[in-house]
């Protein structure tokens, strides 16, 4: 009990104590370090709005709460956008730096994902109280989002592959971020299908399925790399483990998109992709596939939660970072997919489970918002040396695995491996005991 008390005391000083303020730095200088990761907050806020809009067990006023969250998201997005604009105008070099930085460029995806939730909530909260013009607004925003997210995805991965060479040791769940925005196109198509006429919905559904599949397959590739990292290197530092919830999002959102898109196809008149007698089969297949991949999302959710809690109750340092909003957004897909599966198979248990997890996420969001405000006010965020832009680039993977790099830049461990490979490709004497761990 004594050790547990000491750990909790340490966590209090790291996460809740207000008497740990760093030296004062003018706000204009702090905004130089206002990185893209701040949009993870608006991404999560939009996700909470989506959860509130999908709760199966509702009470009077819940829709009003959802609209308040929607307005809050718009306010925060405008505020963060203004801060980012100030940063780029005051410090023009940060425009290029933010794109070329090995970590910060990944978080540009959180800005796009915030916009995706904005479009989703237009259909939930704005469309019922507006006119025909909202149908056009949603459709135009959707196609703009599709184009921008795909361009970002391609260019982000190209820059990563071209400028940064990673090792298994540096594998991170954040690698999945660039594929998230195009993947969410399927979720948006499913969310807005009730607002669009059939002849327009068909094209939106095609793009949605296409990009949802793209996102899911790329996710599987990157997920495998991260699992290999866990096997060979172990889990990340406790402070970085909330990022593991990123693995929950793609399978959960894919299941959600399949069900919602199928429901839109079945309910449209005239029918799209289905006939009068085949709608029920489309619903069955989509639900079947959603359940098939839901298990992966549930496993990733449990693994991430256990890993974080195990790290929380250690003496390893634990400081809040904007990346902690990964607790929320990926799990939004898990909650909504669970609820929709429950509706399709008429299971109150599934719906109740999704509802409970959704309530927990709303509570987590409130706590994370508090931690974010506290971290900013005590100079733990948006402060020189404490944000993503201060992270050093990964060491290049060289030697045997990548002989195109100059030998003098090879990490020491790989240089040792390389000394035991002959010029003809054959192996020389086995390494000595001091190198056996390499």
Curated annotation (Swiss-Prot):
User: GO molecular function of the protein, one example?
Assistant: succinate transmembrane transporter activity
Q: Which domain of life is it from?
A: Eukaryota
User: Biological process GO annotation list?
Assistant: malate import across plasma membrane; malonic acid import across plasma membrane; succinate import across plasma membrane
InterPro entries hit by this protein: Mae1, SLAC1/Mae1/Ssu1/TehA, TehA/Mae1, Voltage-dep_anion_channel_sf
| Entries under Gene3D superfamilies matching the protein | Voltage-dependent anion channel
List keywords of the entry alphabetically.
Membrane, Phosphoprotein, Transmembrane, Transmembrane helix, Transport
Location of the region described as Disordered in the Swiss-Prot/TrEMBL record: 390-438
Gene Ontology cellular component annotations, sorted alphabetically: plasma membrane
List the transmembrane segments.
37-57, 65-85, 106-126, 140-160, 172-192, 205-225, 242-262, 288-308, 321-341, 353-373
Q: Where in the cell is it found?
A: Membrane
Keyword Phosphoprotein in record: yes
Instruction: Give the membrane topology, semicolon-separated if more than one.
Output: Multi-pass membrane protein
PTM Phosphoserine: list the residues: 413, 423, 428, 432-433, 437
Family, per the entry? Answer: Belongs to the tellurite-resistance/dicarboxylate transporter (TDT) family.
Describe the function of this protein.
Answer: Permease for malate and other C4 dicarboxylic acids.
What is the protein name stated in its UniProt record? Answer: Malic acid transport protein
Question: Upper lineage ranks?
Answer: Eukaryota, Fungi, Dikarya, Ascomycota, Taphrinomycotina
The record's gene field reads mae1
């Amino acid at each position: 009990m004594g050790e547990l008390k000491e750990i909790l005391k340490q966590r209090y000083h790291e996460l809740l104590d207000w008497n740990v303020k760093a030296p004062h730095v003018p706000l204009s200088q702090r905004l130089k370090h206002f990185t893209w990761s701040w949009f993870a907050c608006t991404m999560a806020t939009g996700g909470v709005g989506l959860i509130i809009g999908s709760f199966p067990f509702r009470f009077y006023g819940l829709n009003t709460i959802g609209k308040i969250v929607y307005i809050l998201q718009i306010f925060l997005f405008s505020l963060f956008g203004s801060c980012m604009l100030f940063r780029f105008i005051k410090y023009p070099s940060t425009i290029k730096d933010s794109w070329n930085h090995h970590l910060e460029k990944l978080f540009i995806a959180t800005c796009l994902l915030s916009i995706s939730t904005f479009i989703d909530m237009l259909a939930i909260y704005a469309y019922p109280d507006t006119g025909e013009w909202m149908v056009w607004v949603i459709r135009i925003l959707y196609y703009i989002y599709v184009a921008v997210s795909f361009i970002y995805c391609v260019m982000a991965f190209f820059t990563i592959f071209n400028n940064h060479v990673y090792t298994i040791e540096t594998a991170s769940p954040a690698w999945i971020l660039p594929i998230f925005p195009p993947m969410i196109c399927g979720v948006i198509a499913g969310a807005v299908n009730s607002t669009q006429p059939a002849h327009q919905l068909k094209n939106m559904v095609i793009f949605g399925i296409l990009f949802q599949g793209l996102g899911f397959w790329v996710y599987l590739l990157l997920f495998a790399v991260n699992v290999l990292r866990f096997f060979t290197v172990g889990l990340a530092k406790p402070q970085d483990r909330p990022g593991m919830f990123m693995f929950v999002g793609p399978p959960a959102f894919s299941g959600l998109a399949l069900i919602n898109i199928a429901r839109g196809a079945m309910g449209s008149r005239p029918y799209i992709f289905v006939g009068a007698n085949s709608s029920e089969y489309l619903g069955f297949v989509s639900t079947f596939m959603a359940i098939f991949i839901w298990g992966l999302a549930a496993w990733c959710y449990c693994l991430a939660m256990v890993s974080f809690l195990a790290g929380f109750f250690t003496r390893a340092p634990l400081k809040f970072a904007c990346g902690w909003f990964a607790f929320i957004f990926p799990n939004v897909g898990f909650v909504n997919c669970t609820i929709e599966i429950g509706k399709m198979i008429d299971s109150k248990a599934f719906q109740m489970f999704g509802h409970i997890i959704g309530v927990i996420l709303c509570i987590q969001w409130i706590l994370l918002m508090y931690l974010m405000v506290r971290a900013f006010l005590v100079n733990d965020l948006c402060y020189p040396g404490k944000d993503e832009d201060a992270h050093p680039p990964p060491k290049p993977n060289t030697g045997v695995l990548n002989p195109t790099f100059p030998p003098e830049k090879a990490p020491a461990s790989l240089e040792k491996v390389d000394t035991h490979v002959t010029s003809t490709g054959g192996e020389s004497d086995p390494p000595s005991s001091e190198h056996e761990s390499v």
